[in-house]
Amino acid sequence: MCAWDHWWSGEVKMEMDVIKEYIDFAEEQGWPYMLIDWQWYGPYNKAHADITKPAPQLNMPEILEYARSKNVRCWLWLYCTDVNKNDSYKEAFALYEKWGIAGIKIDFMDRDDQEMVNWYHRIIKEVAKHKLMVNFHGAYKPDGIGRTYPNLLTREGVMGGEYSKFSKRVTPEHNVTLAFTRMLAGPMDYTPGGFLNVSMEGFKPKNPTTVP
């Protein structure tokens, strides 16, 4: 289980206090991990995006020390194009190992052609060298590579809980069916829910989500 700061409400931003609150939440729930999600290194998929440099408002050593004091380890989100830029992932993964990062979540691949499949394998192998776990978001369905590289913890490849922010397509019937379809292929990152208890008639997708 992992706390995930992407399910933001209202005007919550990528800030030190917010990250620490999610670390506290992970500790309270007995979860071992907290994911520092998109924009931790500033705007992503931009020419100047650098996956080795935290955004100016974030003090990464302080965050990681705080997490260690709570017996929580951190994951980092990455945009796939930023990972590929000049093979920057090789330097970045070595840096994350020094920081004590538990794993990385790479997002928005959205393809399953041969070139992309080969890329997945290169990334998994490089991550393994640095004792990091990996979660592929925006990913195709599992293909068995996790049997060779168990540091591939999970992947999305599913219409999961985050869709409830902007869609009514995630129904009880859909969720029950997943156990007999998608989950047969391998580990699944369903993504978080909003922890709101309403009937189907009373549910309204809203992004950003709000808590009454």
Task: Give, region by region, the residue ranges found by the protein language model.
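An acidic-aromatic substrate-binding cleft motif
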Residues: 1-29, 33
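Short, conserved micro-motifs enriched in small and acidic residues
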Residues: 16, 210-212
